[in-house]
Amino acid sequence: MQVTYGKGFDVAPMSNRVQALQDAMFAHVTPIELDTKHRFHGGMYLREVFRPADCIIVGKVHKKEHFYIVLSGTVVITTDEGAMEVTGPHIFESKPGAKRAVYAKTDAVCMTIHRVDSTTVEEVEEELVENDPDCVYLPGNKLSGKALT
């Protein structure tokens, strides 16, 4: 496992930097639909996402603690401590308020694991993440109509 920590990042402005990246991407990048698998079991929700190489994804703000796992591949990911390059497998413990940007240097598979009360993808989206009216993804990582315009 290889981990490289970025230097010169302040904890507070990281979410602002990720939001600025999302705003810039919305104007200049064509979104892709992500191969996403959803599993519910015993009050837990697991989301597994395949990220093709040279792809950058900006997620929504998470409301609850959860695990974020890089199963395979190499990604550069933003955390509260800054940007870091990780080759999977690697496990992060994410706090409420986390908003990540993830750049896949290689094909990568990442997953999140959450404790939930919900039993559907639509319900879990409402339970786990803040509403983002600018997001081009519907629950389950399906592209919305605005992504295609």
Named regions from a protein language model:
Residues T79-K99:
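Short acidic-glycine-tyrosine-enriched beta hairpin
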Residues K105-T149:
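Double-stranded beta-helix
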Residues G42-H62:
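Conserved short histidine dyad/triad with adjacent acidic residue
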Residues C55, K63-K64, G82, A98, ...:
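A generic "binding-loop/recognition-motif" signal
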Residues L71-S72, G88, T106:
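A cytosolic small-molecule/anion-sensing beta-strand core signal
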Residues M1-E48, L128-N131, P139-T149:
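A short, N-terminal "cap"/entry segment at the start of jelly-roll beta-barrel domains
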Residues K63-E81:
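Glycine- and acidic-residue-biased ligand/ion/polar-headgroup-sensing regions
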